[in-house]
């Protein structure tokens, strides 16, 4: 490993700054991680104070706020779609002021709205998480994922992490994931794709070596 990026590990809102400061202390002592993506609830009216505290740590590069919303309660992470929330949109816009990127974790049913938000803020780099998380594996779900990925790929400031395959298919194999991986690279190109481990979460579904 040459360099490492730490993505927020699910810290509660009141612990997010403490997590970032702890990670920065590790980097100061041992060099790792080289970059930090912290957590901030962008729909918090007080989010600017949180962002200002995050960037006090020099290795902070971005923010992740998981906003997966799905009409099926089995899949949804949030009680409502925050891409329809004006307070969230205002919080998102503040990322540019602090020079931060956004790790966007959504489902394909949110991609059209995500496209509109990202297009309105070309100065905020976006990293789409977990291959776009196409959890609906039927024909309609596949078509929605493909069209959403194609739309997001038209924005040059949007990149994608190929990861989280266990979220998509808990019994995944190389053959079952190959089309998703290749289609993602085809749409975004090699310069806007990165492979990410998503460990330890993906350890639930397979080994790191696999």
Describe each model-derived feature in a short phrase:
Residues 60-68, 125-131, 158-162, 190-195:
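Non-cysteine beta-strand/loop elements that form the S-adenosyl-L-methionine
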Residues 14-109, 116, 159-168, 175:
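Active-site gating/metal-coordination segments in enzymes
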Residues 1, 47-49, 111-112, 140-149:
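Alpha-helical scaffolding within the catalytic cores
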Residues 135-210:
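H/E-rich (His + Asp/Glu) clusters that bind or coordinate divalent metals
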Residues 1-7:
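Catalytic domains of carbohydrate-active enzymes, especially glycoside hydrolases
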Residues 9, 131, 197-199:
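Active-site metal-binding loops of divalent metal-dependent hydrolases
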Residues 114-118, 132:
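Active-site cradle of extracellular carbohydrate-active enzymes
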Residues 31, 122-123, 156, 189:
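Proline-centered flexible-loop/turn and helix-kink motifs
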């Amino acid at each position: 490993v040459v360099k490492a990026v730490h993505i927020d590990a699910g810290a509660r809102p009141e612990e997010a700054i403490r997590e970032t400061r702890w990670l920065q202390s590790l980097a100061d002592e041992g060099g790792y991680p080289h970059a930090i993506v912290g957590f901030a609830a962008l729909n918090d009216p007080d989010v600017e104070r949180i962002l200002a505290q995050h960037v006090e740590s020099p290795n902070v590069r971005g923010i992740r706020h998981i906003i997966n919303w799905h009409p099926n309660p089995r899949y949804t992470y949030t009680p409502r779609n925050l891409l329809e929330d004006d307070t969230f949109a205002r919080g998102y816009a503040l990322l540019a002021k602090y020079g931060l990127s956004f790790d966007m974790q959504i489902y394909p049913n949110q991609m059209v709205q995500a496209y509109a938000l990202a297009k309105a803020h070309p100065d905020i780099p976006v990293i789409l998480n977990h291959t776009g998380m196409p959890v609906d594996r039927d024909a309609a779900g596949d078509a929605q994922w493909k069209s959403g990925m194609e739309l997001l790929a038209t924005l040059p400031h949007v990149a994608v992490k190929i990861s989280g395959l266990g979220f998509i298919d808990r019994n995944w194999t190389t053959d079952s994931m190959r089309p998703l991986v290749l289609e993602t690279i085809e749409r975004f190109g090699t310069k806007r794709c990165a492979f990410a481990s998503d460990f330890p979460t993906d350890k639930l579904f397979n080994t790191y070596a696999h």
